[in-house]
Amino acid sequence: MAELRALVAVKRVIDYAVKIRVKPDRTGVVTDGVKHSMNPFCEIAVEEAVRLKEKKLVKEVIAVSCGPAQCQETIRTALAMGADRGIHVEVPPAEAERLGPLQVARVLAKLAEKEKVDLVLLGKQAIDDDCNQTGQMTAGFLDWPQGTFASQVTLEGDKLKVEREIDGGLETLRLKLPAVVTADLRLNEPRYATLPNIMKAKKKKIEVIKPGDLGVDLTSKLSVISVEDPPQRTAGVKVETTEDLVAKLKEIGRI
């Protein structure tokens, strides 16, 4: 079992602590000069892959990111956490803004085949678009079994036991490898990269390739019509009686 190899997808997103601003032309959100970091769910996926390696269940952990040159910073973070090497699928910034789950899933599927990995790990969703689609699409392209929203992952021989929380209970899946797993928040607590590991990460290899090298066309089939801030909420009012409530609702045109 020590010969297993894992591919972990990591996405560069606007940091969760940053207040999002919409562009004046409403074509997207402002990203220039804004702090970015690794998607929190991706951090959990990296942590799980590294833990499997520390248990000698996985031989190699490969971190991959698809996007502009700055994505290499995100890959370096994964390398500092314990990934062995990185792959950067370089996409120009303007094109990267239009990347959707379908295009990224095509890239991940091709890389999984090229690298002959046994396990693809990724966050269940990204905090920027909240799509929750990439893992499922990747499994579909590869025709591999999938375990989504994983809260616990255990290797049992040639199968992967995945526990996932569902409404009213816990569901257990046993996936025959190779497989795709998406990480839930409850899967683990990601480690902080230590300074020595950050320094070591600078010496680890990051291979830079183009989507065309994988035979993938990243042309999006979707177009964004408009991006807008949510409407401002108005302050509520207190009423003393049911009659006052009915009168107020009539006043604002709700009844």
Swiss-Prot record:
Record-listed N-acetylalanine modification sites: A2
- Output the SUPFAM superfamilies linked to this UniProt entry: Adenine nucleotide alpha hydrolases-like
Q: N6,N6,N6-trimethyllysine occurs at which residues?
A: K200, K203
Major localisation: mitochondrion
Which is a Gene Ontology cellular component entry for this protein? mitochondrial matrix
Key word Mitochondrion present:
yes
> What residues bind AMP, as annotated?
9, 39-42, 66, 123-134
Which Pfam families does this entry report, sorted A to Z?
ETF (PF01012)
Residue(s) carrying N6-methyllysine? K200
Q: Which domain of life is it from?
A: Eukaryota
Q: Name one GO molecular function term.
A: nucleotide binding
**Post-translational modification summary for this protein:** Methylated. Trimethylation at Lys-200 and Lys-203 may negatively regulate the activity in electron transfer from acyl-CoA dehydrogenases.
Positions of modified residues (Phosphoserine): S223, S226
Family membership noted in the UniProt record = Belongs to the ETF beta-subunit/FixA family.
Its domain description in UniProt is: The recognition loop recognizes a hydrophobic patch at the surface of interacting dehydrogenases and acts as a static anchor at the interface.
Q: What is the stated purpose of this protein?
A: Heterodimeric electron transfer flavoprotein that accepts electrons from several mitochondrial dehydrogenases, including acyl-CoA dehydrogenases, glutaryl-CoA and sarcosine dehydrogenase. It transfers the electrons to the main mitochondrial respiratory chain via ETF-ubiquinone oxidoreductase. Required for normal mitochondrial fatty acid oxidation and normal amino acid metabolism. ETFB binds an AMP molecule that probably has a purely structural role.
What does the subunit comment say?
Heterodimer composed of ETFA and ETFB. Identified in a complex that contains ETFA, ETFB and ETFRF1. Interacts with ACADM.
Q: In its UniProt entry, what is this protein called?
A: Electron transfer flavoprotein subunit beta
